[in-house]
Amino acid sequence: MYGGLNKMDKLKKALPFIFPPLAVLLIMGFAFYRHGLYPFGDGTVSWCDMSQQVIPLLTDFKDIFTGKDGMFLNFHNAGGMDLWGVFFFFIASPYTLLVLFVDKADIIYLVNILTVLKMMTAA
């Protein structure tokens, strides 16, 4: 025995940290499947403010990271604004970097994955 714990004891210690995120994944996976949400269909969890604010900000964030726009002065928002405050209020998360791996047209589906990942992290 290394460190005084056998494999079963290590599993028992880790289970409270592993079970809640997996439970969220299973519950959300079932809900997404049942309602035809991406990745099981074409639906999205995006509604109201997420469609009007968060998704456009994620597309702007992708443009900033790919060099098509600037973080300090962005003319695609409100006729020209500094995006720093908005970044920290809305989209400051390591998960936001996942926008770099999808097309701008698919960001509306990415928010489904981001929602589940954030809920799993919170669990």
Can you name each region flagged by the protein language model?
Residues I27-A122:
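Membrane-interface coil-to-helix junctions
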Residues M1-Y33:
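Start-transfer (signal-anchor) and selected internal transmembrane alpha helices
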